[in-house]
């Protein structure tokens, strides 16, 4: 399911081109937002450099699109060491990871994205590598099999995940520096957008940036994606500046409303309210009603709607809150629950 307001990386975004790399911050000072995380990282990095040691292993976790990969690259750059990147899904065999680990130089940074998708057989050889800087491998099969131990150079594993709860406890406990990345405030996203627009040569003013930021779901990746499409519309319309009006018109054509909901979000809410009286309705029923897979409904559509107080998940099923009726311009029944908004910019 491809949505312009999805925080997940889309095709072509996983491997950024030269122009995309130019838009990314290169240092902690340039990185906007995540102030507490940056302050702590700066201290840990300086301490490790002062001792001439590898930085302790870092786990970056939180919703997609908040800059985990960029932050991992910055860590390596601030340490002045090499950066190697891979991801959990591509490390199918223990040998795949062993080949990478044995080629690391002292204090290098290895980045593993989506570490929650690492196969258990690969994960097991990571434990001694992280803790003791050794690699324990079994060579051969059956009675002739033998184990060998390979010493590794000290290194820093920086891992990223959107599902920290799926990590095995032994793996999670080996990260000395766990860092949760939070959603961005509209002001922070406005800053990100203005900086990106300058590098892109897009004529975006502060009001235009504020309009895009308000609809970007607290996610820099979404903000950047919206900026590119708004720039396209502005260019096609011959606009000399992307102000609030130009940005609003472009976003309306993209069907992203003032609260960051797209047509799929609104279709879900309408199905819940108009087909099932506002609920409770089961997720399977709702998925069938909007012709989407259950996993897509649970993982892609519902999280933001719950965070923003549009729906509640109850033991009996999903229920529409008063905010959903108001947003769709429908009459709110007395029985509609008043959800406590989880807060996009707080704990989710």
From Swiss-Prot:
DNA binds at residues 294, 313, 318. Pfam families: AAA_lid_4 (PF17864), RuvB_C (PF05491), RuvB_N (PF05496). Residues 258-348 are annotated as: Head domain (RuvB-H). Mg(2+) binds at residue 69. ATP binds at residues 23-24, 65, 68-70, 174, 184, 221. The keyword Hydrolase applies. The keyword Hydrolase applies. One of its GO terms (molecular function) is four-way junction helicase activity. Residues 1-184 are annotated as: Large ATPase domain (RuvB-L). One of its GO terms (cellular component) is cytoplasm. Keywords: ATP-binding, Cytoplasm, DNA damage, DNA recombination, DNA repair, DNA-binding, Hydrolase, Nucleotide-binding. Its EC number is 3.6.4.-. InterPro entries: AAA+_ATPase (IPR003593), AAA_lid_4 (IPR041445), DNA_helicase_Holl-junc_RuvB (IPR004605), P-loop_NTPase (IPR027417), RuvB-like_N (IPR008824), RuvB_C (IPR008823), WH-like_DNA-bd_sf (IPR036388), WH_DNA-bd_sf (IPR036390). It catalyses: ATP + H2O = ADP + phosphate + H(+). Residues 1-20 are annotated as: Disordered. It is found in: Cytoplasm. Residues 185-255 are annotated as: Small ATPAse domain (RuvB-S). One of its GO terms (biological process) is DNA recombination. Homohexamer. Forms an RuvA(8)-RuvB(12)-Holliday junction (HJ) complex. HJ DNA is sandwiched between 2 RuvA tetramers; dsDNA enters through RuvA and exits via RuvB. An RuvB hexamer assembles on each DNA strand where it exits the tetramer. Each RuvB hexamer is contacted by two RuvA subunits (via domain III) on 2 adjacent RuvB subunits; this complex drives branch migration. In the full resolvosome a probable DNA-RuvA(4)-RuvB(12)-RuvC(2) complex forms which resolves the HJ. The RuvA-RuvB-RuvC complex processes Holliday junction (HJ) DNA during genetic recombination and DNA repair, while the RuvA-RuvB complex plays an important role in the rescue of blocked DNA replication forks via replication fork reversal (RFR). RuvA specifically binds to HJ cruciform DNA, conferring on it an open structure. The RuvB hexamer acts as an ATP-dependent pump, pulling dsDNA into and through the RuvAB complex. RuvB forms 2 homohexamers on either side of HJ DNA bound by 1 or 2 RuvA tetramers; 4 subunits per hexamer contact DNA at a time. Belongs to the RuvB family. Has 3 domains, the large (RuvB-L) and small ATPase (RuvB-S) domains and the C-terminal head (RuvB-H) domain. The head domain binds DNA, while the ATPase domains jointly bind ATP, ADP or are empty depending on the state of the subunit in the translocation cycle. During a single DNA translocation step the structure of each domain remains the same, but their relative positions change. This is Holliday junction branch migration complex subunit RuvB. It comes from Caulobacter sp. (strain K31).
């Amino acid at each position: 399911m491809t949505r312009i307001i999805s925080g997940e990386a889309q095709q072509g975004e996983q491997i950024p081109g030269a122009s995309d790399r130019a838009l990314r911050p290169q240092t902690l000072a340039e990185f906007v937002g995540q102030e507490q995380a940056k302050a702590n990282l700066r201290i840990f990095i300086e301490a490790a450099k002062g001792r001439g040691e590898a930085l302790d292993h870092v786990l970056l976790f939180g919703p997609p699109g908040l800059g985990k990969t960029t932050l991992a690259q910055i860590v390596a750059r601030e340490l002045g060491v090499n950066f190697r990147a891979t991801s959990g899904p591509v490390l199918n065999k223990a040998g795949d990871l062993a080949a990478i680990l044995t080629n690391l130089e002292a204090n290098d940074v290895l980045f593993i994205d989506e570490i929650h998708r690492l196969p258990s057989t690969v994960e097991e050889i990571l434990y001694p590598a992280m803790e003791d800087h050794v690699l324990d491998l079994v060579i051969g099969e059956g009675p002739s099999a033998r184990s060998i131990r390979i010493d590794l150079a000290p290194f820093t594993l920086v891992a990223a995940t959107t599902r920290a709860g799926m990590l095995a406890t032994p793996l999670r406990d080996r990260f000395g520096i766990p860092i949760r990345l939070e959603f961005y405030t509209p002001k922070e996203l406005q800053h990100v957008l203005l900086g990106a627009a300058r590098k892109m040569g897009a004529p975006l003013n502060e009001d235009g940036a504020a309009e895009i930021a308000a609809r970007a779901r607290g996610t820099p990746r979404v903000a950047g994606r919206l900026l590119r499409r708004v720039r396209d519309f502005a260019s096609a319309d011959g606009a000399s500046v992307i102000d609030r009006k130009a940005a609003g018109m472009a976003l309306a054509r993209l069907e992203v409303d003032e609260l960051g909901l797209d047509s799929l979000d609104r279709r879900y809410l309408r199905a819940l309210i108009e087909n099932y009286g506002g609920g409770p309705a089961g997720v399977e029923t709702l998925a069938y009603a909007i012709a989407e897979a259950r996993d897509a409904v649970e993982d892609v559509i519902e999280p933001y709607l719950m965070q923003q107080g549009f729906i509640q998940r109850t033991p009996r099923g999903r229920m529409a809150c008063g905010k959903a009726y108001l947003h769709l311009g429908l009459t709110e029944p007395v029985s509609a629950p008043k959800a406590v908004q989880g807060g996009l910019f707080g704990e989710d």
